[in-house]
Amino acid sequence: MRLIKLEQPNCNPCKMVSNYLEQVNIQFETVDVTQEPEVAARFGVMGVPVTILLSDQGEEVNRSVGFKPNELDELLKELR
């Protein structure tokens, strides 16, 4: 499984999610929705940040919207 974070420049909650994931030493991919709007459309993302856990086949398993440490912890449990 893999974790992706959809964000845009100058988004403070996006930075908070990145910092949180980096503190717990989790690898994740970052997608700038202003540069790759097709990714946001694929996952039906209307606002950022959105952190999505994907299966090995690329299917969405779970997601967290905004900076919510409890939701992020749930994603991380599923990732491990």
From Swiss-Prot:
Transmembrane segments: none annotated. Disulfide bonds join 11-14. Residues 1-80 form the Thioredoxin domain. CDD domains: TRX_family. It comes from the Bacteria. Keywords: Disulfide bond, Redox-active center. Pfam families: Thioredoxin (PF00085). Signal peptide: none annotated. InterPro entries: Thioredoxin-like_sf, Thioredoxin_domain. Belongs to the thioredoxin family. This is SPbeta prophage-derived thioredoxin-like protein YosR. The lineage of its organism: Bacteria, Bacillati, Bacillota, Bacilli, Bacillales.
